[in-house]
Amino acid sequence: MTPLFRKAVWLLFAVSVCAFAGSLAAQYVLGMEPCVLCISQRLCVLATALCAAIVLMCRPRRKAGGLFGAVFISIPAVTGISVAAYQLWLQSLPPGTAPSCGAPWTFRLKGWPLFDWFEPVVRGFGNCAEPDYLLGVALPVWSVAYFLAVALTVWWAWARAK
């Protein structure tokens, strides 16, 4: 792994941890109630941080290892982009016509062995069709920008490292 690629992955890890902490702060400090899709995006941010940490711990030495790292980090980023884009589409529909965004995560994971520990991360019963704003911009737009920045950064660093 080249120094540039390693620094980029460290940056992505740090930004992902901050974004995850920010999503928890928005819920528990600012009082924003996340919906199922918001929580899915939160889990994609967490997965991005975990993937970056795994790439940093594995320290791939060959170019193929760097390619693996870029693909590995891109998977949750692309998933997050698709979830946020779906939520933006839901929010663009006329009021009352948006379909349900699914069962709450707390219901889906109730029987999971680590549920009591993980429950604060997946708790939320907000409406996916009602937008929340940060600095005048809808939160799914911020999510798309974050995930797009992750994907572009990791592929830029990989291309520069070749």
Curated annotation (Swiss-Prot):
It is a multi-pass membrane protein. InterPro entries: DiS_bond_form_DsbB/BdbC, Disulphide_bond_form_DsbB, DsbB, DsbB-like_sf. Its main location: membrane. It is found in: Cell inner membrane. GO terms for molecular function: electron transfer activity; protein-disulfide reductase activity. PANTHER family: DISULFIDE BOND FORMATION PROTEIN B (PTHR36570:SF3). This is Disulfide bond formation protein B. The gene is dsbB.
